[in-house]
Amino acid sequence: MSNIRLFFSDNILENTTSLLSKEHTHYIVNVMRLKRGSNINFFNKEGEWLSEIVFLERDRVEVKFLNKIKESSITSNIELAICLVKKTPMEIILQKATELGVSRITPIISERTEVKELNLERAIKITVEATEQSNQLNPPVINKVTKLKDFISNINQDKKLFFADINSEYRMKPADIKKNQSISILIGPEGDFSSQE
C-alpha cells in the first residue's frame, strides 16, 4: 500500500519534526488509523517529503521529515475563469480542474449567473484534497469572486483568452497557443452569456 499524501503549507526541512494540525491528526488517527512508525508523504509547492510518525496519541501526532522524494515541478499557466454554478457542480468543477493541473481558478459573476457567492474555505479544502489525490504538488490559487466585466478589463496582453461562442466563425488551432504562454479559459453561466456580454 502506498503512503497517504497530505498537503503541508509550512516549510519542510529534512530531519526536523513537526506537530500536525488538528485536522491532520484526526485524519491520521481516526480515519486512516495509522500507527507510530507509519510513513506519510507531505507535499507543498517546494516538493514532496517522506515522513515517519514519531509520536501518536488520540489528539496529537508528531512526524519527522526524513528526506525529499520529489522536487517541485513547473506549474501550468492555465487559468480557469468560470461563472459560478450551484454547489455540487461547482465542487466537481473545482476538483476536476485541480486534477487536470489548472494553476488558477477565478470564479466569475455574469449577468445570467444565478449563484453570487463561493465558500472560499470550502473551495480551498476541495482543491487541496484533489491535489493530494492526483499526485500533484500545487493546489490552484483561487481568486476572489469577480464580475465578468472586471475580469475582461484586467486581462493582461500577454495572456490568451479562450471562450466558446456558438455564433463565431473562428475555430481555435493548436498554433494559437505558444509554449509556456499564459492562458485563461472562460466558461459561461448555465444560461450562456447575455448578448451584451
Regions picked out by a protein language model, each given a short descriptive name:
Residues N167:
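Carbohydrate-associated surface elements
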Residues E48, T88, Y170-M172, F193:
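Glycine-rich nucleotide phosphate-binding loop and flanking beta-alpha elements
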